[in-house]
Amino acid sequence: MSIRSLGYLRIEATDMAAWREYGLKVLGMVEGKGAPEGALYLRMDDFPARLVVVPGEHDRLLEAGWECANAEGLQEIRNRLDLEGTPYKEATAAELADRRVDEMIRFADPSGNCLEVFHGTALEHRRVVSPYGHRFVTGEQGMGHVVLSTRDDAEALHFYRDVLGFRLRDSMRLPPQMVGRPADGPPAWLRFFGCNPRHHSLAFLPMPTSSGIVHLMVEVEQADDVGLCLDRALRRKVPMSATLGRHVNDLMLSFYMKTPGGFDIEFGCEGRQVDDRDWIARESTAVSLWGHDFTVGARG
């Protein structure tokens, strides 16, 4: 497929000081450099930035950036969008310079989420050393995974699978009441999509959120690194959204916590890698093998 990984997220934030402490002191990312006045560029690896936080009047997702391997891959995405009748814009020179990429296009998915697809990232070759000693799992698996909100699960399934070429790796049936539908209405589906060996780089939930994003997952190499991050979060009184647990589909050992922007970050390790030559997409009927008590978020 043309899209290879989740390259970066750009978010707007109302509390930059809180994000700076959260990104550097809780997540253990490293500050990078960028042009916009007051923006925070957070590095996880040799990318110029994986998470960019821009000051503004709202807490919301601005763009999800998806990486193609080369110009041919990006052109294939243009062709697919043309066939679907989805408009897109070529990036300006300023946008290319800010993202530090060779080519990029911008467009909206059917729910209005802004996507950027690019190739040719200019890497930083200074080693990223987290102040807490952990290393993030990125490389060909990209930044991690993101769960976006969508207004229509069938519409999103068509767009991401049939137009953009993501591979459906898993599905989970949700009660229709969870997304505001009648109890006897059709179920809502939580869909999980891959574009590299990571079990999923993208999922979507058919339920509106104020930020447009349900959660972002970042992965580290060892279970102790997850526990140490949990300790840091608890010491700083970061609100928890779910206890430590292991998911059934991607086998991620993780916990969930709130960000200063109101959405969740899943911080985990030991995520499953799959090979599409023998992977079979199925329905998951449980969220986790153990743990992941999401009622802690409601109690908090």
UniProtKB/Swiss-Prot annotation:
Its cofactor is Fe(2+). CDD domains: BphC1-RGP6_C_like, BphC1-RGP6_N_like. It catalyses: 3,4-dihydroxy-9,10-secoandrosta-1,3,5(10)-triene-9,17-dione + O2 = (1E,2Z)-3-hydroxy-5,9,17-trioxo-4,5:9,10-disecoandrosta-1(10),2-dien-4-oate + H(+). Keywords: Aromatic hydrocarbons catabolism, Cholesterol metabolism, Dioxygenase, Iron, Lipid degradation, Lipid metabolism, Metal-binding, Oxidoreductase, Repeat, Steroid metabolism, Sterol metabolism. Substrate binds at H200, H215, D250, Y256. It comes from the Bacteria. Its EC number is 1.13.11.25. Induction: Induced by KstR. Gene3D superfamilies: 2,3-Dihydroxybiphenyl 1,2-Dioxygenase, domain 1. Disruption phenotype: Cells lacking this gene completely fail to grow on cholesterol due the blockage of the catabolic pathway and develop a pink color consistent with the accumulation of toxic catechols. Mice intravenously infected with the mutant survive substantially longer than those infected with the wild-type. Binds 1 Fe(2+) ion per subunit. Pathway: Steroid metabolism; cholesterol metabolism. GO terms for molecular function: 3,4-dihydroxy-9,10-secoandrosta-1,3,5(10)-triene-9,17-dione 4,5-dioxygenase activity; ferrous iron binding; iron ion binding. InterPro entries: Glyas_Bleomycin-R_OHBP_Dase, Glyas_Fos-R_dOase_dom, GlyoxalaseI/FosfomycinResist, HsaC, VOC, Xdiol_ring_cleave_dOase_1/2. Fe cation binds at H145, H215, E266. Residues 5-120, 142-270 form the VOC domain. One of its GO terms (biological process) is cholesterol catabolic process. Belongs to the extradiol ring-cleavage dioxygenase family. Catalyzes the meta-cleavage of 3,4-dihydroxy-9,10-seconandrost-1,3,5(10)-triene-9,17-dione (3,4-DHSA) to produce 4,5-9,10-diseco-3-hydroxy-5,9,17-trioxoandrosta-1(10),2-diene-4-oic acid (4,9-DSHA). Homodimer, but may form a homooctamer. Cholesterol metabolism contributes to the survival of M.tuberculosis in the host by helping the bacterial multiplication during earlier stages of infection and to the dissemination of the pathogen in the host. This is Iron-dependent extradiol dioxygenase.
